[in-house]
C-alpha cells in the first residue's frame, strides 16, 4: 500500500515529508491548535508562503493524482452476423435510423396519436424528471471535488458566580464577573482527491446521468410502439365488429328463409331453431368485441395522458380500416443494435457507473488527506474591550494545516465492500450481454411475426373467398330443396370464422412490423431539440426551486443532451461546479 502511495505522489509531483500548520495570532477559543511561534514576522511570512505552496500542491494532487480502480471497458457483445431471415426479399440490410417509422403506415390519425402521446404521456414525463434528478446528482458529485466552506458566528456571555471560581479572569485584585465574547469567521475543509475517490464519484454520477437519458429514450421507444400497437388493435377490433354485424345481417336472412320454408311445410322447426341458434351466437360476439374495443380505447387514453373522455377524432373514422404495412422493411444487421437500442446503451452505462464505484470503495483503503483552515476574528468585553474589535486587525486570527485520516483497522469491512462493488459490476456486465441477446430475440420474433402473418393472411383470403362461395351455393340449394340445412349452418359458421381470422391476421401484420421497429430501437429521435419535461412542468419546478441553467426559462433552448448516449459521452472528471 505504501508503494502505491509513493507512486501516486510521484505522479502528482508531490512529496509529503511532514506536517504543516500555519497560524496568525489565532484566538485559542476559535481556531485550530497552533504549531509554531506566530509572533515572529519572518515565521508568519514563511507560513503564508507555505500555505501558497500547499494550495498549489493540493491542486496538483486533485488534477494529477492517481484514480484508483478499473477503467471501464464494455464486455464483448454476443451478436450474430445476420438475421435468420436475411435471404427474404422483404428484408433489407441497409443503414436506417427509423426516426419516424410510424409514418410508413400512412395513417394521419396514428401520426396525431404519436404527437399527443409524446407531449402528454405521464410515464414519459416521470422518466424525464429522473433525468433531472440524475443531473442534479452529478452536480453534487462535482461539488465534492472542491473545498467546503462554512461561515461561523457566535456570541457567548460569561457569568462567573464567585471570585473563587477557577475560571474567573482577574487583573490584580479586580475580578470581572460578567463579559461577552464574539466570534466570526470562515472555516474551510478540503479533502484532496489524491486517490481519485471524488473523480470516480463524478464518473459514477456522469454515467448514471447518461443512463437516465438512455432509459428515457427506452421509455419513449416503448411508448411509441405501444401507441401504434394499441391503435392497430383498436382498428382490428373494429374490423371484427363490422364482420360480426355483416354476418348477423346475412344470418337473419337465412333465418327468414328457414321460417318461410317451415311455414310452407318444406322444412321442420328444427331448421328454424338451428338458424336462430347460430344467429344468437353471432349477435353475442358484438358485446364481447365491444368490451375489447372499450378496453383498447381506455388503454389508449392512458398512453395519451388523458382522463376518460370521448376520442371523437378517432371514433369518427371507425370503419375498421387496419393500417397497411409496406412490403419491405430495412432491418440492418444485429451489430447495429449496440448503437441504436436505448436499453442496451443504458445497461452499458449502468455497468460503467458501477465500475467507477470500485474505485470509490478502494480509495477507502488509503489515507484521506485534507487541508483545514479558518480565518476570522474574535473579541470580548473583558477588561473594557469592545465586540466591534472583531473587525480590527488585533482581533483577526488565521490557522491552516493538513489533516490525515486512515482507516487501518476495520475488520475487513472496506475490503469486502470493494468485493461487493466488483461482484455488482460483474452482474451488470452479464446484464448488458443478456440485454444484447434479448434485443436480438425481439427482432427475430418481430420479423417472424411480420413475415409469417402475411403468409397467413394470404391463405385466409383464399379461405374467405371459398367460404363465401360455399355459403352462397348451400343457401341456394337449400332454397331449392336439394341440400339440407346442416350444410347451410356449417357454411355460415365457416365464413364467420374465416373472416374473423383474416381480420386478426391482417392486424397482426402491422403489429409485427411495429414490434420490429420497437426491437430495432427506433423513434427516440422525436425528442431531438426538446427538453425532458414539458414546458408546464418546467415552469412549475422553476417557480418552486432555483434550477439555474438545468431548466431554462420558457422560450430558451434546453440544455444539449446526447442522442443515445454511451460511456464516450461522459465529460471530464474535474469540471467547474454548477450553482
Label each region the model flagged.
Residues 3, 24-27, 37, 43:
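Intrinsic-disorder-associated, low-complexity terminal segments enriched in Asp/Asn/His/Tyr and depleted
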Residues 5-9, 41-55:
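Bacterial N-terminal signal peptides that target proteins for export
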Residues 198, 214-333, 449, 453, ...:
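Periplasmic alpha-helical coiled-coil/stalk elements that build and connect Gram-negative outer-membrane
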Residues 67-228, 368-373, 378, 395, ...:
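Short flexible linkers and secondary-structure junctions
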Residues 87-105, 155-187, 310-330, 359, ...:
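Small/polar, glycine/serine/threonine/aspartate-rich low-complexity segments that form flexible
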Residues 53-64:
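Bacterial N-terminal signal peptides
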Residues 125-126, 142-143, 178, 192-220, ...:
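Sec/SRP-type N-terminal targeting helices
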Amino acid at each position: 500500500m505504501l508503494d502505491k502511495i509513493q507512486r501516486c505522489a510521484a505522479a502528482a509531483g508531490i512529496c509529503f515529508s511532514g506536517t504543516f500548520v500555519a497560524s496568525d495570532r489565532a484566538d485559542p477559543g476559535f481556531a485550530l491548535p497552533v504549531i509554531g511561534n506566530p509572533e515572529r514576522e519572518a515565521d508568519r511570512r514563511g507560513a503564508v508562503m507555505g500555505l501558497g505552496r500547499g494550495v498549489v500542491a493540493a491542486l496538483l494532487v486533485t488534477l494529477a493524482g492517481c484514480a484508483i480502480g478499473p477503467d471501464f471497458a464494455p464486455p464483448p457483445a454476443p451478436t450474430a452476423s445476420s438475421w435468420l431471415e436475411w435471404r427474404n426479399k422483404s428484408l433489407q440490410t441497409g443503414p436506417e435510423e427509423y426516426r419516424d417509422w410510424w409514418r410508413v403506415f400512412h395513417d394521419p390519425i396514428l401520426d396525431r396519436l404519436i404527437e399527443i402521446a409524446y407531449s402528454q404521456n405521464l410515464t414519459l414525463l416521470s422518466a424525464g424528471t429522473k433525468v433531472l434528478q440524475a443531473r442534479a446528482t452529478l452536480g453534487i458529485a462535482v461539488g465534492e471535488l472542491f473545498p467546503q466552506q462554512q461561515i461561523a458566528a457566535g456570541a457567548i456571555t460569561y457569568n462567573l458566580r464567585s471570585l473563587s471560581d477557577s475560571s474567573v479572569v482577574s487583573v490584580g485584585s479586580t475580578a470581572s464577573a460578567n463579559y461577552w465574547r464574539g466570534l466570526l469567521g470562515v472555516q474551510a475543509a478540503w479533502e484532496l482527491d489524491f486517490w481519485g475517490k471524488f473523480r470516480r464519484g463524478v464518473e459514477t454520477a456522469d454515467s448514471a446521468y447518461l443512463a437516465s437519458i438512455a432509459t428515457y429514450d427506452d421509455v419513449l421507444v416503448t411508448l411509441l410502439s405501444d401507441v401504434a400497437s394499441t391503435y392497430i388493435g383498436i382498428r382490428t377490433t373494429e374490423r371484427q365488429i363490422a364482420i360480426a354485424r355483416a354476418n348477423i345481417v346475412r344470418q337473419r336472412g337465412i333465418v327468414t328463409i328457414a321460417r318461410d320454408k317451415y311455414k310452407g311445410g318444406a322444412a321442420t322447426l328444427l331448421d328454424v331453431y338451428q338458424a336462430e341458434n347460430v344467429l344468437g351466437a353471432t349477435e353475442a360476439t358484438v358485446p364481447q368485441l365491444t368490451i375489447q374495443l372499450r378496453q383498447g380505447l381506455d388503454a389508449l387514453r392512458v398512453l395519451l395522458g388523458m382522463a376518460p373522455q370521448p376520442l371523437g377524432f378517432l371514433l369518427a373514422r371507425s370503419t375498421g380500416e387496419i393500417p397497411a404495412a409496406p412490403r419491405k422493411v430495412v432491418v440492418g444487421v444485429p451489430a447495429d443494435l449496440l448503437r441504436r437500442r436505448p436499453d442496451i446503451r443504458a445497461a452499458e452505462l449502468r455497468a460503467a457507473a458501477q465500475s467507477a464505484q470500485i474505485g470509490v470503495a478502494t480509495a477507502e483503503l488509503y489515507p484521506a488527506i485534507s487541508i483545514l483552515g479558518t480565518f476570522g476574528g474574535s473579541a470580548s468585553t473583558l477588561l473594557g474591550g469592545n465586540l466591534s474589535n472583531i473587525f480590527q486587525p488585533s482581533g483577526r486570527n488565521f490557522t491552516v494545516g493538513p489533516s490525515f485520516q486512515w482507516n487501518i483497522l476495520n475488520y475487513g469491512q472496506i475490503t469486502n465492500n470493494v468485493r461487493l462493488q466488483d461482484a455488482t459490476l460483474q452482474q451488470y456486465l452479464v446484464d448488458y450481454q443478456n440485454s444484447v441477446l434479448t434485443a436480438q430475440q425481439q427482432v427475430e420474433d418481430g420479423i417472424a411475426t411480420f413475415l409469417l402473418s402475411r403468409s397467413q393472411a394470404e391463405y385466409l383470403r383464399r379461405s374467405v373467398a371459398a367460404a363465401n362461395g360455399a355459403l352462397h351455393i348451400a343457401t341456394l340449394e337449400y332454397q331449392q330443396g336439394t341440400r339440407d340445412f346442416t350444410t347451410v349452418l356449417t357454411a355460415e359458421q365457416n365464413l364467420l370464422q374465416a373472416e374473423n381470422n383474416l381480420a386478426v391476421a391482417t392486424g397482426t401484420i402491422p403489429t409485427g412490423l411495429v414490434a420490429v421497429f420497437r426491437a430495432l430501437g427506433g423513434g427516440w429521435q422525436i425528442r431531438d431539440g426538446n427538453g425532458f419535461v414539458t414546458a408546464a412542468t418546467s415552469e412549475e419546478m422553476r417557480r418552486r426551486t432555483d434550477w439555474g441553467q438545468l431548466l431554462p426559462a420558457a422560450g430558451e433552448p434546453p440544455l444539449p443532451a446526447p442522442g443515445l448516449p454511451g460511456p464516450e459521452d461522459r465529460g471530464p472528471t474535474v469540471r467547474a461546479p454548477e450553482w
